[in-house]
Design a protein with these regions (language model features):
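Hydrophobic alpha-helical segments
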Residues: 266, 279, 285, 316-317
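A cross-kingdom feature marking solvent-exposed beta-strand/loop segments within repeated
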Residues: 85-96, 110-112, 269-280, 295
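Short, structured motif recognition centered on aromatic/hydrophobic residues
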Residues: 35, 89, 104-108, 124-128, ...
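Hot-dog-fold acyl-thioester-processing enzymes
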Residues: 1-87, 149-273, 329-338, 344-349
Length: 349
């Protein structure tokens, strides 16, 4: 009996299957420091204990994307070790803040399977839940990923595609129990813009660009114990037409989110992921730019508002003219990410 694990192929998954993922991870200040080094986020709520305490929290929580990447990384050996690409996200909810010292674990349920027409790959839909050391769920999300089949001849007897919500409803958003923005310090946060200053339909060019190098993306992906072959195995990737390793999509998400500080300085706290699509593969060396559109707004009380934001990232193309889809629905060739999320922002009133 082999003691090594080749990972699951598409035909190994079953609808309703539950996968408990190995290697619990205790979050440390070192994780926060490395996250800052890789992406350069500047949101005050995650940077300063004193700022966070003034907002009613016991200390600075980690950026929600840190928790997301850790939980995502736990799931990779069971779900996407043999992936072609991660395709998208939906129904993501951040249920509780995560602090250094918390230990995160993850498990996933297979909620959909769809074999592709080439019979060489299929799409696996999973709902992944991350819990802390107290057994409390801290985040939950759906993702779907294209996975290779071990054998093209393998039959897939039961297939189904889940019916997923277009967006998380504002009434379902969860803010940390003690969060209170009534004494929010806009000067220390870096900008005066509050909930009232953003209008539905408004578009914001985040101006700045950031290149991602080969070593950076590999280290950033290893930080989360993400083992997907497409990010690391250059020997195998040399057989692909691109001949290159794919950059983990989460690297693009976090880079674009860090860039969004310029224009959304007070919208760092992600509450939900409504949807997301990696529009085209990203390879290291290109410069990432980003722009955002305000899709909706909601008053959550306690001086807290929420903005529903569409964040679009591009490769090697500034976003002053907001590149996205054309009149036929086709994306601009430079677009690499289309990401829809809710973020908390302070209210003045």
């Amino acid at each position: 009996m082999s003691k090594t694990d080749p990972g699951n192929y598409f035909e190994d998954f079953k609808l309703g299957q539950t996968l408990v993922h190995a290697t619990p991870r205790t979050v440390t200040a070192g994780d926060v420091a490395l996250y800052t080094a890789f992406y350069g986020p500047r949101f005050s709520l995650f940077s300063s204990d004193e700022f966070a305490r003034a907002c009613g929290l016991p200390a600075a929580p980690v950026d929600p994307l840190v928790a997301f990447h850790i939980v995502f990384g736990k799931s990779v050996p069971d779900i996407s070790l043999n992936a072609v690409a991660n395709l998208g996200y939906a129904e993501g909810l951040f249920l509780a803040p995560v602090y250094p010292g918390d230990t995160l674990m993850a498990e996933s349920e297979v909620i959909g399977l769809k074999e592709n027409s080439n019979r060489k790959t299929g799409v696996v839909y999973v709902r992944t839940t991350g819990t802390n050391q107290h057994g409390k769920a801290v985040l939950r999300y759906v993702r779907w990923v294209m996975v290779r089949k071990r054998s093209a001849e393998a039959e897939i007897p039961e297939q189904s595609t889940p019916d997923l919500a277009e967006a998380v409803a504002a009434k379902d958003l969860i803010i940390p129990a003690t969060l209170d923005f009534s004494k929010y310090d806009y000067a220390l946060a870096g900008a005066p813009h509050a909930f009232e200053d953003y209008a539905i339909g408004e578009r914001i060019d985040h101006v700045d660009g950031m290149a991602i190098e080969e070593a950076e993306h590999a280290m950033a992906t290893r930080l989360w114990q993400n083992t997907a072959k497409v990010h690391f195995n250059q020997f195998e990737r040399s057989k692909d037409p691109s001949g290159r390793r794919l950059v983990y999509g989460g690297v693009v998400i976090s880079t674009a989110k860090a860039l969004s500080f310029n224009g959304l300085q007070n919208a760092g706290l992600i509450l939900a992921i409504n949807g997301g699509r990696h529009v085209s593969p990203y390879f290291a060396g290109g410069t990432v730019f980003a722009w955002s559109e305000v899709l909706d707004k909601a008053d959550l009380g306690h001086g807290v508002g929420a903005l529903r934001l569409r964040m679009v990232a591009t490769r090697d193309r500034p976003c002053d003219d907001f590149p996205g889809k054309d009149e036929t629905g086709a994306y601009n060739d430079h677009v690499i990410l289309d990401f829809d999320y809710w973020a908390a922002v302070p209210k003045r009133g």
